């Protein structure tokens, strides 16, 4: 197993020096889910929630969050993202919505944290927009699905 990189020899937190790393194309894909009551799911699916287009607003929130990750996670590097894609998969039998966020950059450090942050904020936005009718929604299963590029190469969950 690799060493933790955000601590120096004295155990103090520090931001990792990526100055000597090569600029490479980097990609990360993350996902997470929110499960709700069937009636709430129908409101979201049909676009008839009182606050408006839940998934449209959640998509924009996810994109905004990916761009602000370094402001939220103390030791993350500010990254110039080159692409952010946000998709939703609706599973009616379980009243579950999956959010999938793909982030890309050409730089010296990965974009995993940006993808994960985008997923979390999308799910929180769905919760916020639907909580008036369903406070029991459950968010979960947030995870990195894959990452590509950089010194450590490619990684795919379950591979």
UniProtKB/Swiss-Prot annotation:
InterPro entries: MoaC (IPR023045), MoaC_bact/euk (IPR047594), MoaC_sf (IPR036522), MoCo_biosynth_MoaA/MoaC (IPR050105), Mopterin_CF_biosynth-C_dom (IPR002820). GO terms for molecular function: cyclic pyranopterin monophosphate synthase activity. The active site is at residue 128. Its EC number is 4.6.1.17. It is an enzyme of class 4 (lyase). SUPFAM superfamilies: Molybdenum cofactor biosynthesis protein C, MoaC. It catalyses: (8S)-3',8-cyclo-7,8-dihydroguanosine 5'-triphosphate = cyclic pyranopterin phosphate + diphosphate. One of its GO terms (biological process) is Mo-molybdopterin cofactor biosynthetic process. It comes from the Bacteria. Keywords: Lyase, Molybdenum cofactor biosynthesis. The keyword Endoplasmic reticulum does not apply. Pfam families: MoaC (PF01967). Pathway: Cofactor biosynthesis; molybdopterin biosynthesis. Substrate binds at residues 75-77, 113-114. Catalyzes the conversion of (8S)-3',8-cyclo-7,8-dihydroguanosine 5'-triphosphate to cyclic pyranopterin monophosphate (cPMP). Belongs to the MoaC family. Homohexamer; trimer of dimers. This is Cyclic pyranopterin monophosphate synthase.
């Amino acid at each position: 197993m690799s060493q933790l990189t955000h601590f120096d020899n004295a155990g103090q937190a520090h931001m990792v020096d990526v100055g000597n790393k090569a600029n490479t194309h980097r990609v990360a894909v993350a996902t997470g889910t929110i499960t709700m009551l069937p009636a709430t799911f129908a409101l979201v699916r049909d676009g008839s929630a009182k606050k408006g287009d839940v998934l449209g607003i959640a998509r924009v929130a996810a994109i905004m969050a990916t761009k602000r990750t370094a402001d939220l996670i103390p030791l993350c590097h500010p990254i110039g993202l080159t692409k952010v894609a946000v998709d939703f998969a609706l599973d009616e039998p379980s009243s579950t919505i999956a959010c999938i966020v793909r982030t890309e950059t050409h730089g010296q450090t990965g974009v995993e944290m940006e993808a994960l942050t985008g997923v979390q904020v999308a799910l929180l936005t769905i919760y916020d927009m639907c909580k008036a009718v369903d406070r029991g929604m459950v968010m979960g299963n947030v995870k990195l699905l894959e990452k590509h590029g950089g010194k450590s190469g490619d990684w795919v969950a379950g591979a």
